[in-house]
Amino acid sequence: MLAAISGSYVIPAMYSLSPNPHSTPFQDKVFEDTYDTVLMAIGRRALTEETAVSNAGVKVIPENAKIDSDNEQTNIPNVFAVGDVLHEKPELTPVAVQAGKLLAARLYGNGTTQMDYQNVATTVFTPLEYGCVGLSEEKAEELYGADNLEIYHAYYKPTEFFIPQRNPQRCYLKVVCERAAPQKVLGMHFIGPNAGEVIQGYAAAVKCGLTFETLESTVGIHPTLAEEFTRVTITKRSGEDPTPQSCCS
């Protein structure tokens, strides 16, 4: 659950420093500050203890009570799990639905397709949305090394920002690529109106092996938000200012 609350607040933020998911959350340390917006991400936990999966012999990860599985099959061959209960899998409803459909097809319909948990797109539905697919810049650096990456980025001004002359630095996009040609796209990130709609379309392209060479050769639809990805040329490595210099970014 996510909520943004306007106003000025003094919030005593209390966080558990214990890895035990069943410990009391309000303990150990208190941080206090004043905020103009409070973002509450309540989250959820796996109910494997309440459902007593251990009685069937199913093993769980002690730190989070989740089940470690490659193809939704637990350590007990005839017990399967899908959704948020799986360890290190995206906690998203569409992921659970897709995995469940494919599992049912394999069990009862002679299907062979496994769930692909890589490059799953998602969006945070805040007033200016944030959408992404693929790797973050930090994760890409961890896997590939900073010297082997090229990070394209830009601020942009949506059409609806022109009349009120809103600050273009509220909207931002980033493309994480391999440095070597043809620069395979490893991640795409977008902050702005309708980010979910924009990223949903590019998610299919990323799963198909999108490269930056293909992206920059694509003609955008003007004026749209999604076209900003086809216009980005500035890299972080260059040190150039990514702020738009004209009405068309």
Please report, for each region that a protein language model flagged, where it lies by residue.
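Conserved beta-strand-loop-beta-strand element in the redox core of flavoprotein oxidoreductases
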Residues: A3, G7-E32, V38
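A short, glycine/Asx- and small/polar-enriched loop/turn
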Residues: S18-P19, I76, N167-R170
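Flexible, glycine-rich terminal cap/loop adjacent to redox cofactors
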Residues: F125-S136, E141-S249
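Conserved beta-strand segments of alpha/beta enzyme cores
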Residues: Y9, K59, D147-E150
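Flexible, acidic loop-helix segments that line cofactor/substrate-binding pockets
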Residues: T113-E129
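N-terminal glycine-rich dinucleotide-binding loop that anchors FAD/FMN and/or NAD(P) in oxidoreductases
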Residues: M1, I5-G7, L135-K139
